[in-house]
Structure formats: C-alpha cells, structure tokens
Regions:
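Exposed loop/turn and edge beta-strand positions of beta-sandwich/beta-sheet ligand-binding modules
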Residues: 30, 186, 197, 274, ...
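Extracellular beta-strand/beta-solenoid scaffold signature
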Residues: 112, 117-135, 155-162, 183-194, ...
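N-terminal domain-start segments of secreted/luminal proteins
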Residues: 27-51, 98-152, 156, 180, ...
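Short, T/G/N/S-enriched strand-turn elements that build extracellular solenoid repeat scaffolds
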Residues: 31-36, 42-45, 49-55, 72-75, ...
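Extracellular beta-helix/beta-solenoid repeat scaffolds
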Residues: 46-101, 150-210, 214-230, 235, ...
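Short terminal (N- or C-terminal) low-complexity/amphipathic segments
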Residues: 3, 520, 525-530
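Gram-negative bacterial Sec-dependent N-terminal signal peptides
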Residues: 1-27
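All-beta strand scaffolds that present successive hydrophobic residues in beta-strands
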Residues: 36-37, 42, 50, 55, ...
Length: 668
C-alpha cells in the first residue's frame, strides 16, 4: 500500500516527515501574530501559522528563494494583499510550478505562469513541496486513490488539483473557487487539471463550482487521459478587470468572442494539447456563459460525453466546441443550451445512443478502465439536443454524424454553415429526428464573423459586420453543377423529415476570422482519426484560437436522399440579416437570416434521390437534379409541380438534369 507518498522535496520518505512539513510553526520566530509595516518586506522561510496577520499598504510578503507563496485563512486560499487576517492564518511557500504558454501573435513573447495549487501529483505521488496543503482539506493517498480533497479559494489564479503524471483516482473532491483565473489556454487557475502523456486522472463524484472570469472547472492537457464520472460541475461568469479590452489573442482572451454570436467569460471545461482525451460519464457539466465542453490549441483529440447533461444556465453560450481535427462524441447525453449545441471549426461531431456495443468500444478505444458491472450500470438512452437557437454551427470545415434515436430540437436552424465545407450525415433508420423551430434544416451562408482589429499586437474585438450591397459576381472557374471537396454535403438516410435547405453563399472570399495570412496560432492539422464512433475527416485548419482566416467561399450544397421522405424547399438563395450593420451589441443577429430563393450564381444546389420521395413545398432553384428509377418528386396535395431546365419546360421523370433547374409549385 502507498500511504501519503509525499515529502518536503524528493524522494518520498515517511508520512510523519510529510506531516511535519505541512504543519509549519507559530511564525518564523514563534509569534502568533505578525504585522508587516508599509515599505517593509517579510520573507517567509517555511510554512508559518499565525492567529493574526496585518499587512500594511505598501508592504510586501514573499517566500524565500523565489518560491511561490499561498495564504490560507481557516483553510480557505485567500489573495495575498494588504489587510487584516484573523483565525487559522497560514503562509505556505511552495516550489514553483512554472507553466509556459506560447500565446500572443506569431513571433510574440511567451507567457510564463507560476501555478500555485492545493494538491500537486506526479508519477511519484503527492508532492508536498509543490502543494499548498493548508488549502487542500484532509488529503489521503492510498493505492492510487486520492480522497479528502476539499478546496476553498477566494483568491485569483489558484489551482485546486494539478496532476502531471501517474494514474490516479480522485475520489469525491469538493472544490469551490471564487475569483478570476489567469489563462484558460494554459489551465491557470483551474479547479482540476491533468497534463502530460502518461497521465491518467479519474475524477469520481466530484462537486465543483467556480465563479470568475476564465476560472475553468476542468482542464485536460498535453496528451493526458481525463475521465470524469458521476460528477457535478458548474461555472459562473465573473467580473472582468476594469482595464480589460475584449480580444481573441490566445493567452490574453478572457471572454467569449462575440463574433461567434455568444457571450460569457468562463468556459466550464477546456481540452488542450495534442492527443488529449477527456471523457465525461453520467455527469452534469454546466456553464453560465461562453461554453461547456470546449477544445482549443490542439489537434487529434477526443472529447466524449456519455449519459451526461450539458447545460448553459445563462443567456448565451454553446455546448461544445470542435477544433483541430477533434472528435466530439455524445452518447446518451442531453444538451440544454442557449445558442449552439456544437460549434465546429476543423473538428467533427457525433451524436448517438449509449448502446452497450458503443460503450464497450469506447471503453477499449479511450482506455476508460470501466469494469463489466460499471458498463452494465450505464443506462442506454438517446442523445437529445435542446437549443434555444441553433443546433450545430460551422465557421471552419468539419463533419457531423447524427444516428440512433438522437433528437435535435432547436429554436432556429438545425445546421448553420458559415463559409465552410461540411459533411452532414443523418441516419434516421433507428429513429433520429430533427425539429427546426424556423423550419430550416440546413442554412449555408458566407462567414459573417467580422473578425478582430489588431491594436498594439492584440487582436481586439472591434470588427463590425456590414451586409454586402453589390450583386455577387459569377466566378468563371467554379462549376455549380459538380460536387467539390469543399462543398456542403448532406446525406439523409432512412428518415422522414420536414424542413428547408438553403445555399446563400455569394462567392469570392469569406470576410471575417483571422487576418489574411495568419490563420490560427497552432501547428498545421492532419486528418482526424476515424474512431471512436465517428467519421474521419480531411486535413483541417491549423488549430489554435477559435477562429479561421479568409478563404474562398464559393461552394455548392449537395443534398442526397436515400430511403427517405422529405417535405420542404431545397434552393439556392440570397440571404439577408435583420440589420445591415452588426456590432457587439447585436451579436445574436449574426447567423440569423431570411432567404429569397433564386437562380444560383456561385452557390450551386445538387439534389440526388435514391429510393426516396421529395415533396416540394415551394419553388426550388437547383443546378443539378438526379432522380433514381425508384424515386419520386411531387407537389403537395392540391398543387402542381413544373420542371424547367435552362428555361425550357421538361417532363419530370427518372434521370439527371443539370443547368438552371427550377421546380415551381403552384396551386391547382
């Protein structure tokens, strides 16, 4: 048995020595009270316990040897500042935990953070010299299980549990943190964090609450494997510094980029670094704003939720963010979100049921370590996505796969694609359903993200969207009758569906996103892996911050029906926002458009029917229509359908029609 494997430095020695290290003494000279006068400096040599501490304005309290210093009052981590402190007052010097982040503009300076944490674990055990144990509760480590963690923090930039190596189970931790974090791209100030290849952290029955800007609840980083089970996690927005300027520079960004149509300043969780896995099982994860299950600065990652609740409790935010060829997979989970279920830029999302076969596959592929009784205890249920606005939004290339008995219930459009290539697969053979509140299943538009403005090397969120006024110009080298690798391709299989599909791409270059030539701030991405349970993907944009750069936006919408019945309009269109000029105050108007169907310019629409029926409910403008021998295209009862190709009336029969293809519906 390994019991409390800690020491004052390294290697581990007896538990008695560790406890002596943590206990400290009555002051450095035996006093129970200490006053630090203005202009003076008190250098703390060892863990020191007082009954009262007074720090005058202009005084300084530091740890010896350049180490970090943590103040606790009655076991609560407290910001070290001028003031009067009374009770069980402890000052704990700890060895520095230096974390560097290559944020800022390309070629910019590296950020260096000095993490402080209540509990620091590595492959050798609990490291007392890096742990502010006075803030940790009654910690016990036995046979790889860490129990007794109770962290209360009212200071800024304080981490709860930091695991950098080894295989640990964190049993029933309770963490409450109030105050802002420092950098959620690095995990600075997170309640729970795993980092490093070879690190596996199982968090079991955790209760975590944070209240502060970028005071993230959970961080998985740098190739670690994080598994969260039966836990309750929630974050709440904080108060931003008075001098903060909203921006999207990684490492400096402290609030959501409004150009995505969201607000808030604390992501509940963040997955970072290459080859990192994070899995949430039978857990509740909530954020007041911004996002719940986020990914950033990474590639080739897996973010999985099984039988979990994913919630935005405030007025704005998303359920999950897919970037850098990530695979974001949701099985038996329920979304209750304000703006988007998932946002995609370079990642892939899968929605399905928590079937026994799926669970066993995930257990192997993600190294979850679930026993047969644990697997059997997970109830099979569908994934249900409730969003007050959109289901999935793209502002970068990626794919979505919807299967089993998944239900999308959205106030607005099910799938909103902004100037990106997208692959959307909907398999209704097991009962999947899509309910769009505005009647639009797929909407393709140019990217209306106005992008930042660079001020003194910082990408400030001062961009403004302006509705184009000129008519789109036809691009001679773009074929609107053929499928391209960059198109939006929707495949409907075995589903009965009512709703419309619009392609309102204008063509040319999409405005917004990162400045030209910059892209994102990470290494180039490669194709995403094919598992677990999701499609592979082609090379995505470079990972990094949650943006994409300008790129050619001419693209077709391809809709394939296989063994399906669709009632609705499929058409090229022109789109118009509710306001011609959209700034930060109108952030929720981004992506909200009305459509006027019309002949395609750079926005081809190709429809393929295989053993399917399309009931055309309104005039539809296509560039290609392929009707299989066992397929049907018809008007609703009491209406007549007329087909013209390049202005010529044609009988509608099995075959392929290309050019300006118009299906006109009239009464009678």
């Amino acid at each position: 048995m390994q019991f409390l494997a800690i020491d004052c430095r390294r290697p581990a020695i007896a538990a008695v020595a560790a406890l002596l290290c943590a206990a400290g003494a009555w002051g450095d000279s035996g006093e129970a009270a200490r006053s630090v006068a203005a202009g003076s400096t008190w250098t703390v040599e060892q863990t020191t316990q007082l009954r009262t501490l007074d720090i005058a304005p202009g005084a300084s309290v530091i740890a010896s040897g350049g180490r970090s210093l943590t103040l606790t009052v009655d076991g609560v981590e407290t910001g070290l500042a001028a003031g009067h402190y009374a009770g069980d007052v402890r000052l704990t010097p700890t060895d520095n935990n230096i974390v560097k982040f290559g944020g800022g503009m390309p070629g910019g300076s590296e950020l260096t953070h000095y993490f402080r944490q209540a509990v620091y674990l590595d492959a050798g055990g609990l490291v007392a010299s890096k742990s502010a144990l006075a803030a940790a509760g009654k910690v016990r480590l036995a046979d790889g299980v860490v129990s007794g963690v109770r962290v209360r923090s009212v200071g800024e930039n304080f981490n709860g549990v930091y695991v950098a190596g080894g295989h640990y189970t964190l049993a029933s931790p309770s963490i409450y943190a109030t105050g802002n974090g420092g950098n959620d791209f690095a995990g600075y100030g997170a309640a729970l964090m795993s980092t490093g290849k070879g690190t596996t952290l199982i968090v079991d029955h955790a209760h975590v609450r944070t209240h502060g800007a970028i005071r993230t609840a959970v961080i998985a980083n740098d190739g670690s494997n994080l598994i969260v089970e039966d836990s309750d996690i929630a974050t709440f927005n904080g108060v931003l510094p008075a001098d903060y300027v909203t921006n999207v520079t990684p490492g400096m960004m402290k609030d959501a980029p409004w150009m995505l149509g969201i607000r808030g300043n604390c992501r509940a969780t963040n997955l970072l670094g290459n080859d990192t896995n994070a899995t949430y099982i039978n857990s509740s994860i909530a954020a007041e704003g911004w996002g719940v299950l986020s990914i950033d600065s990474s590639r080739n990652t897996h973010l999985t939720a099984i039988d979990s609740r994913i919630s935005i409790t405030g007025t704005s935010g998303y359920g999950s963010y897919a970037i850098g060829n990530s695979l974001n997979a949701f099985y038996g989970s329920t979304f209750n979100v304000a703006d988007y279920g998932v946002i995609i830029t370079g990642g892939n999302a899968v929605f399905g049921a928590s079937t026994p076969a799926t669970l066993r596959r995930l257990n192997d592929e993600l190294k979850l370590g679930l026993s047969e009784p644990q697997l059997s205890a997970i109830k099979q249920q569908p994934t249900v996505l409730h969003s007050r606005r959109f289901g999935v939004m793209w502002h970068g290339d990626g794919s979505v796969k919807v299967g089993d008995d998944t239900v999308f219930d959205t106030g607005l459009t099910s799938f909103l694609v902004k100037g990106a290539g997208a692959t959307i697969s909907i398999d209704g053979t097991r009962g999947a359903q899509l309910h769009a509140g505005n009647g639009v299943i797929v909407q393709v538009i140019d990217n209306d993200d106005p992008g930042p403005v660079t001020v003194d090397g910082v990408m400030v969120n001062k961009g403004v969207y302006h509705e184009p006024t000129a008519a789109p110009e036809k691009l001679a080298d773009f074929d609107v009758t053929q499928t391209h690798a960059t198109d939006v391709v929707v495949t409907l299989t075995g589903i009965t569906l009512a709703g419309d599909f619009y392609n309102a791409i204008r063509g040319g270059a999409a405005k917004g996103g990162a400045p030209a030539g910059m892209g994102s701030l990470g290494p180039g991405a490669t194709g995403a892996p094919a598992g677990p349970g999701g499609p592979g993907a082609g090379g995505g944009p470079p990972p990094g911050m949650m943006m994409g750069g300008p790129k050619p936006a001419s693209r077709n919408l391809v809709v394939k029906l296989v063994d399906s019945q669709l009632s609705g309009v499929i058409a090229a269109s022109s789109a118009k926002h509710r306001k011609d000029t959209i700034g930060a105050e109108d952030y929720q108007l981004l992506g909200v458009v009305s459509n006027t169907p019309g002949a395609a310019v750079n926005n081809g629409v190709l429809v393929e029917l295989d053993h399917s029926t399309w009931t055309v409910t309104g005039t539809s403008y296509l560039t290609s229509l392929s009707v299989g021998a066992d397929a049907h295209v018809a008007a609703p009862a009491g209406h007549t359908l007329r087909l013209t190709v390049n202005g010529q009336l044609r009988p509608l029969a099995a075959g392929t029609y290309k050019g300006t293809v118009v299906l006109e519906v009239t009464p009678g």
